[in-house]
Design a protein with these regions (language model features):
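Compact nucleic-acid interaction/catalytic patches
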Residues: 17-57
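Short, well-ordered loop/turn sites that connect or cap secondary structure elements
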Residues: 2-3
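C-terminal terminal-subdomain/extension
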Residues: 60-110
Length: 110
């Protein structure tokens, strides 16, 4: 199943989380062992947190949503059910920045 960073997929996240939209955040690497994909889940519960990035109602999302980077996870590629669409590059940059901040990957400024 072909997937790219910035795409939104409907994914089976297991019994507790059920099926929900996720943003793919890992690179497409056909040589990677394990066939896993990293994702950030979307939710409609906006807590106004630095761990969340707001998404407007896009054509493939029926409600305003937020990407919750604290929910970063991995699933087998086989659990991606169908591609819904792609978020704009400017929003993906905000998701990547929020992930870098949450994981303390920001480089100190000199």
């Amino acid at each position: 199943m072909d997937h790219q960073p910035g795409e939104v997929w409907l994914a089976d996240l297991g019994l507790a989380a059920k099926t929900r939209p996720v943003i793919i955040v890992s690179r497409r690497d056909p040589n990677a062992p394990g066939a896993l994909v990293l994702y950030v889940p979307l939710t409609t519960q906006d807590r106004q947190s630095r761990y969340e990035v707001s998404l407007p109602r896009l054509g493939f999302l029926d409600r305003d949503s937020v990407a919750n980077v604290q929910g970063l996870g991995s699933i087998p590629i086989a659990r991606l059910e169908r591609k819904l669409g792609r978020i704009p590059n400017q929003i993906m940059s905000k998701v990547q920045s929020a992930l870098a901040w949450a994981l303390d990957l920001e480089t100190p400024s000199n």
